[in-house]
Each structure stands twice: as structure tokens, then as C-alpha cells.
Amino acid sequence: MRRLRRLVHLVLLCPFSKGLQGRLPGLRVKYVLLVWLGIFVGSWMVYVHYSSYSELCRGHVCQVVICDQYRKGIISGSVCQDLCELQKVEWRTCLSSAPGQQVYSGLWQDKEVTIKCGIEEALNSKAWPDAAPRRELVLFDKPTRGTSIKEFREMTLSFLKANLGDLPSLPALVDQILLMADFNKDSRVSLAEAKSVWALLQRNEFLLLLSLQEKEHASRLLGYCGDLYLTEGIPHGSWHGAVLLPALRPLLPSVLHRALQQWFGPAWPWRAKIAIGLLEFVEELFHGSYGTFYMCETTLANVGYTATYDFKMADLQQVAPEATVRRFLQGRHCEQSSDCIYGRDCRAPCDRLMRQCKGDLIQPNLAKVCELLRDYLLPGAPAGLYEELGKQLRTCTTLSGLASQIEAHHSLVLSHLKTLLWREISNTNYS
């Protein structure tokens, strides 16, 4: 014990020779303070890591809840047997950024997948933080027993009209949903199958995946069980999901986000190819088969890409249908335009006379994406391209006015940007 005390004394209190201590008495105190500060910060980081992990990463809770409902016959789905009976769905890295939306990387049928599951009800009570929760069956309460397939079809169509708008393409989407619900191909939709699909439709991202399933830049849906679903593996580029602790992500300044993206991101020509894919995704969101969609959180966190540097939207949670945004904003009480915001950056004007928000957005998707691309593309851009690219991006970011009234200008600016980038990387290995 005496030897241990002497060792601690030597490390903490005697870092310098006695002669040096005599000449610089203040250094010893500073050294001790620095060491203890390091110990404190390290302890805090360990505490944050484990507390945030236990709060944000509750895949085991999600699996217990889903499999409990499956064994009771309340829900079903194409991955239920593999998830709950055969244990063939492997949960790997936790990527969750909010307790209510569990996101994990995983492996299923020898494919890299992303596992997503909502457990809002399960997290409401703190009485059993580590035990399997008794989830109330609020999510799986519709449709009720006795509902006919015709009634379920009408119910689904009404839901889609409310969220996507009254579009002529919706009946075809309803047919696809019913086909997906009949995962065992027995030509009938059971109550458990209907409950599962209805619960999935309440998930914003799942509805977006269905609406954008034919688009190149959205992840493909692979299977589901209840309201848990699997998509293609998380694309490259979502580096902060693995590098940063989930609790620290919101604390990181946007400037540091951008710097890290440039340091750890791909070479400039690959970034140009990814940017072209992002611009194509903006086109896909504008007047598609199922209406217009708005990007309501435009950040580098969502700029994902495949192994061949083709753009993939990393997260569709903050992409919203026009009808949903309008319903939320129109008629909402406001004193100024800052009161009329959906998500993070979908803003509408405030009618100060009526003190109500209007339904049309001020800034289109393209203007927000171009703001993002200024930080993503200009650093490291070729000298001969830098000035023209900067000019095009500045023009793009100034797009304003009602999003529904700028279609022609929107398309022209977008086309010019894509052409400029393609010209730079065409006839090279990067194309």
C-alpha cells in the first residue's frame, strides 16, 4: 500500500525534478489540475456513453415487444419467423438518435440491412427500464375484428388521401399495399396482416418508402414484422452514426460537421457524383407519381452513398408529403414567420393580418440543397470550375417565392447545375 501511495505521489505531485520545481513552483499545481481535469472529463465521457446507450439503444426491448405480439397472433409479417423463432435477424450496431425510433444495422439472409422499430409506448413508463414492457395495443388496434377487405381498402385509401393528397394514382398504391400485406401469398389478408400494415403506414418513413419505392435514390424495403421493418443496409457517408456517441450528435456545431465531412469524406470528383444524385433526388420529390414531397431537415447527415458513390437518402424521416405539411401549417396561429415551421426548415409565410400561417412554403427543396452543396462541393473544387460553380450555387440558393410557382425556373437551375458537374467528371474514372 505504501508503494502504491508513493507511486501516485510521484505521478501526480512530482512530475518535475526538485530543482525545476523550485524554479517553477506554479507548474506542479497546474500539472495536478490538468491531470484531475482529464480524469473528470474521461469519467464524464464514460458516463455519457453508457447512460445514452442504455436510453437510446433498446433493440432488445423492441424485439421482445414485437415477438410477444407475434406469438399472440396479433401481428404478422415476412420477417416474423426469422426474427422471433429462428433468430436469423442479427442486430449489430446501434444507430438510434431518438429513444422512440430504434435504428440498428444488421444482417438478414446474408444481406446487410437496417432494422427500424418504434417503441414510443414502451418508453413512456420508467417503472421497468430493463424489463420487457407491457405495451398497450394502441398501435395494433386497427382494423378491428369483422372488418371486410373492402372496408380495409377504403380505410387505407382515405388514409393515403389525407397524407398524400387526392391523387389518381392512389388506388394503384392501395393494391400494392394489400399485395404486400399478403406476404404468405394465400390470396387473403388476415386480421394480423392488416393490423401490421396499418401500423406500418403510421410510420412516416415507411409511407415515404412506399411512395418512393420506384425511385433510384431511396432505400429499398426488404421485409417487416408488425411495425418493425428492414431496409437496405445504411449507406456510406452516415459516418457520425458510428463515430459519435448518439447523445453528442446534437451538440456538435454545424461547422464541425462540415469540417469532419470534408476530412473523412470522399475525394472531390466522387462528391460531385454524389451531388448529382442528390439533385436527381430533388427532381424525384417534385411532382412524382404520388405528389410533391418536401425535405424538412436538409443536413449532411442525410447525404449517404453506395460503394460506387451513387447517392442514397440516408434517412427519410424528415421528408414529408406536401399534403401533410399543408395540413399542419395552414390556419396555424402565428405572430411572425418563425412560428410557421414544419420540421426543422420547412417554412411558410405568416399572414400577420389574419395571424395565420399560409400553406405554401417559402423556400423550395432545391434552394436548401444548394446551400448544403456550397459547403459540400466548393472546398477542394478544381480551380477552373470553382468560380462558375460558386456562381451557379449562389443563384440556386436565392430561389424563393412560393414553391408551387417556380417550377420552370427550378427545373432550369437544376439542369444547369447537373450539366456543369457532369461535364467536369465525364470521360473520367469517376463517371
From Swiss-Prot:
The transmembrane segments are 31-51
What does UniProt say on post-translational modification here? Among the many cysteines in the lumenal domain, most are probably involved in disulfide bonds.
User: What cellular component GO annotations does this protein have?
Assistant: endoplasmic reticulum membrane
SMART domains the record matches:
PIP49_N (SM01299)
Membrane topology, Cytoplasmic segments: 1-30
Query: Which Cys pairs are S-S linked?
Result: 57-94, 62-117
Which residue intervals are topologically Lumenal? 52-431
**Where in the cell does this protein reside?**
Endoplasmic reticulum membrane
**Which protein is depicted?**
Divergent protein kinase domain 1B
What is the protein's species of origin? Answer: Mus musculus
